[in-house]
UniProtKB/Swiss-Prot annotation:
GO cellular component term of the entry, any: cytosolic large ribosomal subunit
Organism placement in taxonomy: Bacteria, Pseudomonadati, Pseudomonadota, Gammaproteobacteria, Alteromonadales
Summary of the function given for this chain in its UniProt record: Binds to the 23S rRNA.
Molecular-function annotations in GO: rRNA binding; structural constituent of ribosome
GO annotation terms (biological process): translation
Source organism of the structure: Shewanella oneidensis (strain ATCC 700550 / JCM 31522 / CIP 106686 / LMG 19005 / NCIMB 14063 / MR-1)
UniProt xrefs under SUPFAM superfamilies: L9 N-domain-like, Ribosomal protein L9 C-domain
Keyword presence, Ribosomal protein: yes
Protein name, as recorded: Large ribosomal subunit protein bL9
One Pfam family recorded for the sequence: Ribosomal_L9_C
Alphabetical UniProt keywords: Ribonucleoprotein, Ribosomal protein, RNA-binding, rRNA-binding
Cell membrane listed as a keyword: no
Amino acid sequence: MNVILLDKIANLGNLGDQVAVKAGYARNYLLPQGKAVVANESNVKVFEARRAELEAKLAADLAAANQRAEKIAALEAVVIASKAGDEGKLFGSVGNRDIADAVTAAGVELAKSEVRLPLGALRTTGDFEVEVQLHTEVKAVVKVSIVAEA
């Protein structure tokens, strides 16, 4: 199925690209989320008319993500207290939601889907650098310090 992308999508293309994707991916993800439209003659004309508006929206999203990245870079280490044993091993773990909530409490809005933990949840006390992806082009690093609750 050929679609016209209305947003930049990682590993697929940029705004305005006509790409061939599997029908299920288009029907179940791209079209309902408003990230693409079916590539037919009428939609191509409508897209060309809206292209400037969509590019401006994309630029505004990128600028907002860059501002959030600067705020995150300015943050001191975010401290998360969790129950832990004598050797620093946590009873449980610190995951995406915990990190997102702690950063939001520190003053920078962060969704749990933006936190990247490629090795899984954090299970020990200590200092960690966690990557957050605010936009397809914007990444930032949050310093997280996990301490044992008294």
